[in-house]
Amino acid sequence: MSAAPARPAPGLARGARTKPSSRSAIDGTPGRSSRRRPRRGDLNVRDAGAFTKLIEIPIARGVARAAVAPAKKFFLDGKRTSEREFANTTVRAPDTDLAEYERAPMQALSGYDVGEVPFVMQAVCYYEETLDVGVLERGLRATLAKYPMLAGRLDLRVPGWQNKGVKLTNDGVPLRVIADDDLKFEDLPQDYASETRRFLDFSPWIDVMLGDAPLFTAKVTQCAGGGSVLGVCMSHAVSDGQGFIEFLVAWSKAANGEAHPWGDPVFDRTLVSQPEPGQSVEDMRAMLSAEGFDNVPSVPMLGGALMAGRTLVPDFLRFPAGNRMMVSVNTDNLRNLREASGASNDNEALSAHSWLALADLCELPRGTPLEHVTVVSGRGGRTGLPDMYFGNAAIGVCTGRVSVGDYDSLAEVRDGLRPGFTKAMMRRNKYLMLTEAAFRAGVNGFDFDIMAFMQGQMCWCNNLVEIYKKLYDLDFGGGGPSLALPPELNDIVQIQCSRPDRSTGAPAGANGVEMFINLPPATMEKMRRPEAIERLAGARGIR
């Protein structure tokens, strides 16, 4: 299955403007109800990136450690008192000494990386064969030799994006092993919910920002009677989801004495499309304003997110654990969606379907803005970054600046979004440059309406089929996982490959896709109605 014409990649990506788009992103002709909120320009740009900027203030760092940390441990880390810890190991890069934080060399981060500091990616994999922790540890140690920044700690203290990075201290990665005598493998939950977060060891974002916590954690839960759960977390500051997955692939290969088939990771941030040399912050802000990157002050942006039901959890602003819902779009329904839409590939059909279904089911008044945004990878192809680039290179692009009622059929939605997809891919290097400039200049301005995104009033569609199918290839010596639960990202519509069917032996991806819908809790009540689930699954209401 084709992941997308634009090779979508994961994470809370930022992107660039596809001017003024809707019916035609190429010629600029507006759609039937295309609307834009009033331009805010440079208003309050200095409010952007408030969390990162606080770390630059010594007294703020002290307050965070002395006052916030104890409360954070109580509210965010969850209960561990009932866990029976079997082992707790710190894994470090081999043949490398520990380095004092102040004197350790620094691996530079991009402005985009720094903007992603509060966010955490995670994945959970179920293994029917009990994992050999010794094999995991040896493989992880060998992999850290090629990914030394994951054994380091963030340093955000000095003002200026160019002064922030990862101190290569080799403090290491925690690998914890829990023995759960009451948990049987067959009783493991089949999707993310509040109970599945127990399989993860989060490094709370405050600790990560302070440089007090690891950038990657691994936790193994050994089940009663055999079987294991592997839960992993990685800070979004060091990479997006594609880099995350390729690291996991490298780990599993190293556990078997093999190298990653694509070679070694690439860390060089100068490969990312850059603003013009010598361009001042004021120049970048003027350029961004001309491109329509309208700044939103941090306080109202976060306030809107909290009002919509997002919560401050260890991996920053998310809708509550278990809020999202998985809907299976089987092979037959996916074929029907392609035929009804006239799409040239599955991603195009699913993008049109998800927008039209949400426009129907959210019960928003006709004419209400409901942008369609897709996520494009800056990697690959003749002009893209290397496939093994380890950093943030996924960009969110508004492929349809449209409103409820603009389109009445899948074919109309496809026609409306297609120019946006084409333009997004053709200009992805420019979009990546604008994204980098936005974070360097401290502007909370993106191609899409960030307030609408935070409030969940948008069709943010991230197709991760090809990338996260690789989770099923994570073989540490006893075979791949029987189920790999994908990251609980901020995506409103996240598309994954279908899970393996144990009854038929069908592998992952053989029976269509799984769509994960993650809207505000109040809206999710509407999505959970039986008729809404059938609509989202492509089993009814297709037109």
What spans do the regions from the language model cover?
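Acyltransferase donor/substrate-recognition loop-hinge adjacent to the catalytic core
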Residues: A305-F316
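A compositional signature for long Ser/Thr(±Pro)-rich, low-complexity
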Residues: F119, A123, P300-M307
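Intrinsically disordered, low-complexity regulatory tails flanking kinase catalytic domains
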Residues: E291-L302
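Non-catalytic N-terminal regions of enzymes
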Residues: S2-A3, R14-R17, R23, D27, ...
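Helical lid/core segments from catalytic subdomains that handle acyl or acyl-like groups
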Residues: M326, R335-N336, N347, Y389-D473
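Short, low-complexity disordered leader/linker segments with a strong preference
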Residues: A6-R7
